[in-house]
Amino acid sequence: MENISNKPLSAIISEVADRYWQRINDVFPELANELTKEQGEELYRIMGLSDFIADQLCRHPQWILSLFNGELNNLSRSEFDKDLHGLLSECQSEDEANRVLRCYRNKQMVRLAWRDFLGYASLENSLLDLSALAEALIISARDWLYIQACKQYGTPMDSEGNPQPLIILGMGKLGGRELNFSSDIDLIFTFPEHGETQGGRRAIENQQFFIRMGQRLVNMLHQVTVDGFVYRVDMRLRPYGESGPLVVSFSGLEDYYQEQGRDWERYAMVKARALGPWTAFSDELHSMLRPFVYRRYIDFSAIESLRKMKQLITQEVRRRQLTDNIKLGAGGIREVEFVVQSFQLIRGGREPSLRQQSLFAAIDTLYQLGQLEYLAVDELKQSYLLLRRVENLLQGIGDQQTQTLPDSGLNWYRLCHCMGMASEAELRTHIESAMSKIHRHFIETVGGRTQDEGADLWTQQLWIAYEDDDAQTLIKEQMIDDPELWPQLKSWRETVANRSIGPRGRDTLDKLMPWLLREFTNLPTPSDALNSVSKVIDQILTRTTYLELLYENPGARQQLVSLCCASPWIAAQLAKFPMLLDELIDPTQLYDTTSLDDYGSELRQYLLRVPEEDMEQQMEALRQFKLSQQLKIAAADVTGVLPVSQVSDHLTLLSEAIIEQVVMQAWQQVTARHGVPAYLEEGVTGFAVIGYGKAGGIELGYGSDLDLVFLHSFSREKYPDQGETDGDRPIEVGHFYLKLAQRILHLFSTRTTSGELYEVDMRLRPSGASGLLVSEIEYFGEYQREEAWTWEHQALVRARFMFGSNGLSSRFSELRSEVLQLARDGSDLAKAVRDMRTKMRDHLLKVKTGHFDLKQSAGGIADIEFIAQYLVLANANQHNELSFWSDNIRIFTGLGELGILAHADVESLIQAYLFLRDESHRQTLQQKPGELPLDLVAEHANRVMDIYQRILVD
């Protein structure tokens, strides 16, 4: 490592150093007299190189002398643990402990950054130092909190009376002792055995003890105070992610990974390491996890898993438009990790020496085992070291988590100074060379695709043709009978020529279009395909990465053409949201719709790619997940892979997964500010989301909005002394739930680059638009019994519990059943339902003569729904089971089984309902209004009208 303490500073760095020098002399006037000339020059230099160091020293000028008096040169990692345990042992409160941890962290980070910037330590040692500091801070905080928690709850014991510890798995670079300067820390909390606490006022289960302790530990590390934070903590790698318990037992971990562990979790577990002093429990935990991570056989399936993970990262880079990213870009830090870990996962089951968390150690072992040649090892290591050094310096400038090369001249000068480079151009050349070498080895190991230029295609000649006769001759030679193809292509090409694309984009377009034209000319009417696909290409002309994606992936091109021709709605989605093109790369995945039970877990995994604290990116990720899953459903729908009868099931279950995440994100934001309502038990929100309409009836379509009602479980009569939240800014519980509801609606409705998440309609809540945004559940029941109109009871037939605790779910079901089972006069009910249907038809039916509105015309979907609602309200008092289902199909089936509806009528209504809903989906996918020629639906409509007349009119 080059020592740069005597290298002259550039003018732009000196200008920054001057400002900090003045500032520090203002707060420490006698400093100049305390330092030698060499020390003064070194201090001046380091303040010009790092804003973080300079800012911390201006706040804590007393650190300067202690750093010069040996701390910069003499560093023993074992001191971290000893110092922290000593300092924390004197703390009497959590506030004191927070202050100690943050001040110690900041001083040591200044010390380590100083050594790094001036070349006093090699990169390997810097990473070891940073990892040791993080481990000491985490473990000392854990140990201090364990003592406090034992005083409060008693000591957790196993069945034989042995104390149980909290074991913390450090994941990622922390586990590998390769932590960068400003990094999140990924942790998993676990404990050996279930049992109860002993010695407290009352016994609680071990898991409850560790969950409470774990929550305090995360806050102690993560929370931002006046002294800053210790580390940003990410707990989402634990089993079941955010929806899983914060802490699980060893047996819980083992069961999860054996039964549900995914490939990406195997990859993550390669670097997992039990933090703190090694114990028998550490051995037990690692032995238990080993069979999941390392298979007994040589496991080449790991290659495909890593390839898919890399594909996801590449998509993320495109979607977030990350340029100059030395971690995630092609040839970045992550690709080195993939190369090494692919060998570890493939051969680690047979080669115990590969089972190690450190990348540096693993890559040396691969050379010793003959798995990598010396040149590959040398290139990978040197390139990796360069990128990690740049990453560390980038983050040390402002203590910010970034892997993106600077967009300011100042930070380039700082990087060049520390890296011993004369200019940005020289450093960029070294970085690009390193990334090129890494990417080459990545492709050789994990695989990739190549493609010919396509110069021999006849469509190449068509794309560059200028004379009409030449183009028409080419088309005739191929026996293509489509007079619109050339005029349309020529016109579109002229439009494109006037667009500002840039040389790289234009070159890629010129390579792509012959291949697309070949796809078009294999179809009966190529001009139709060109018309549809060109609208997508128009939207990505200035997004060269997407043009390259289509050029490099034949499968993506084929799917683009196929889907755009099959559905204008899909074409419009692809044009509006180009990031969806990533979904076309792998046709097997595109048409493999997520199973109905897996939308929640898939979404949790998807959100792991986004920093937990970055709410803007979290909102964007939710929208992108919805769009990509919706595309998969539509693709499977139009190609017949997914039966039409299941489309609504998938769209509805997708919405449920998103609702859960939106509520939990809103919950985290509101509780971070105000705390949790004091009346709640641990891990419960006391909040429920009720779906009405299509959401309640499990009948969502493409582009459907959500009819929702929000409820909460708080009651002032039941909890008279717990009417506020428990945070630093407590508010009344009713106000808390109002803020939560407002935040949820904000997360749904905010329009990002990926659009709106869902349009949410809250007008079905008690008292409609004039009512409270969120109601207490008992008031909801009272309103439904005493104030609601008949049409509100009709709506309640379609209501379904979509999010909340089991207790709230049970209570809602009871209240709903009570209301639906109220005794009603049959003729009065029929008149009220009939009048509402007439009013709705008069207001909403606008269809031209000879056409049939699928929903509002007589004999349409609305008539069928009103028949179901009337029959439930009229008969549930005598047949309680009718109040169970919210979807029309099962309601009609139940009515038939009870003999209330004739089986022929049941069959007619179900067939008509499915037919009309299917046609509604079809019309949406074709971007046509929800109507058909009357003769196509007359048979179904006439049967429905006949049944409607017999039941509601005669």
From Swiss-Prot:
Residues 454-954 are annotated as: Adenylyl transferase. Pfam families: GlnD_UR_UTase, GlnE. Keywords: ATP-binding, Magnesium, Multifunctional enzyme, Nucleotide-binding, Nucleotidyltransferase, Transferase. Belongs to the GlnE family. The keyword Cell membrane does not apply. Its cofactor is Mg(2+). The keyword Nucleus does not apply. One of its GO terms (cellular component) is cytosol. Residues 1-450 are annotated as: Adenylyl removase. Involved in the regulation of glutamine synthetase GlnA, a key enzyme in the process to assimilate ammonia. When cellular nitrogen levels are high, the C-terminal adenylyl transferase (AT) inactivates GlnA by covalent transfer of an adenylyl group from ATP to specific tyrosine residue of GlnA, thus reducing its activity. Conversely, when nitrogen levels are low, the N-terminal adenylyl removase (AR) activates GlnA by removing the adenylyl group by phosphorolysis, increasing its activity. Gene3D superfamilies: 1.20.120.1510, Beta Polymerase, domain 2 (3.30.460.10), Glutamine synthase adenylyltransferase GlnE (1.10.4050.10), Nucleotidyltransferases domain 2 (1.20.120.330). It catalyses: [glutamine synthetase]-O(4)-(5'-adenylyl)-L-tyrosine + phosphate = [glutamine synthetase]-L-tyrosine + ADP; [glutamine synthetase]-L-tyrosine + ATP = [glutamine synthetase]-O(4)-(5'-adenylyl)-L-tyrosine + diphosphate. Its EC number is 2.7.7.89, 2.7.7.42. One of its GO terms (molecular function) is magnesium ion binding. GO terms for biological process: regulation of glutamine family amino acid metabolic process. It comes from Shewanella woodyi (strain ATCC 51908 / MS32). This is Bifunctional glutamine synthetase adenylyltransferase/adenylyl-removing enzyme.
